[in-house]
Amino acid sequence: MNESRRFLVSGTVQGVFFRSSAKRHAEQLGLSGYARNLVDGRVEVLAHGPTDALDELAKWLEEGPPNAQVTGVEVSAVGEQPPEGFRVL
């Protein structure tokens, strides 16, 4: 079953290639969506795809790329479905 989730990732997540790494990981999982920086220092990831792939992405987001220091991930289900592909905004 496909669904969409929004992840808000806190910590040292900007300036450490978090968005591009999230894009690469999401694409490997076959997810569509986007990753973007927020003005408050967090990264927002909206992803759509199979539940098991979203669960895998959620696990990865808790760690992020090597230079990131993730302190929290807020997850919410959303009704919107992003366009095909995964983008860095």
From Swiss-Prot:
Reactions catalysed according to its record: an acyl phosphate + H2O = a carboxylate + phosphate + H(+)
Organism superkingdom: Bacteria
Keywords associated with the record: Hydrolase
PROSITE patterns recorded: ACYLPHOSPHATASE_1 (PS00150), ACYLPHOSPHATASE_2 (PS00151), ACYLPHOSPHATASE_3 (PS51160)
Active site per database record: R19, N37
GO molecular function, one term: acylphosphatase activity
NCBIfam families: PRK14451.1
Family, similarity comment: Belongs to the acylphosphatase family.
Name of the protein in question: Acylphosphatase
Organism: Alkalilimnicola ehrlichii (strain ATCC BAA-1101 / DSM 17681 / MLHE-1)
Gene designation: acyP
